[in-house]
Amino acid sequence: MRLVIAQCTVDYVGRLTAHLPSARRLLLFKADGSVSVHADDRAYKPLNWMSPPCWIVEPTDGDATVWVVENKAGEQLRITVEAIEHDSSHELGVDPGLVKDGVEAHLQALLAEHVELLGAGYTLVRREYMTPIGPVDLLCRDEQGRSVAVEIKRRGEIDGVEQLTRYLELLNRDSLLAPVAGVFAAQQIKPQARTLATDRGIRCLTLDYDKMRGMDNDEFRLF
């Protein structure tokens, strides 16, 4: 990961345009290929960002350095760096990933057992299907035999959609699996996350944890 603190302006050029005037900001260049621009507020949320894969060019023109970050759709972040206060790179290695809380782990187990909740004809291929950047919660096949990656959360937020998007990009490079569709499943899905998922062709599924636990309860089983 590369960390840069700089006085800079930022322009986004793509389907829309956006401009951030000159200010001191933190620029994050991550090993996964993402770039994000942060201010000293907004918690973890960036002012602007570019999701992977994207490419960075750092030419020097005149008095200011213009860093151009471009994704495969041709959208650009143009970062005009006026002064750099800090520039360092760090090798963080492979992260073990977030350990799911009890509810998320139970949701995963229940959905794996009752995979028909995803749709008629769905079958489970594997839980915790490993990718180079971490495990997909469930890998399934739909009624037509097509691969489906399922990410399960207790609260469905934008970060979860981004995580599933990265998994899908990698899985779709595997000719034995592609094409791979995505399902974002959670007890509660925030409107912004649902909008982003829909825009990316990812289906959203709201899970009723209490009902699913009832399905798992011996009291409700005939045998």
From Swiss-Prot:
It is found in: Cytoplasm. Its main location: cytoplasm. Keywords: Cytoplasm, DNA-binding, Endonuclease, Hydrolase, Nuclease. Its EC number is 3.1.-.-. InterPro entries: Endonuclease_NucS, NucS_C, NucS_N, NucS_N_sf, tRNA_endonuc-like_dom_sf. One of its GO terms (cellular component) is cytoplasm. One of its GO terms (molecular function) is DNA binding. Cleaves both 3' and 5' ssDNA extremities of branched DNA structures. Belongs to the NucS endonuclease family. NCBIfam families: PRK03298.1. This is Endonuclease NucS. It comes from Mycolicibacterium vanbaalenii (strain DSM 7251 / JCM 13017 / BCRC 16820 / KCTC 9966 / NRRL B-24157 / PYR-1) (Mycobacterium vanbaalenii). The gene is nucS.
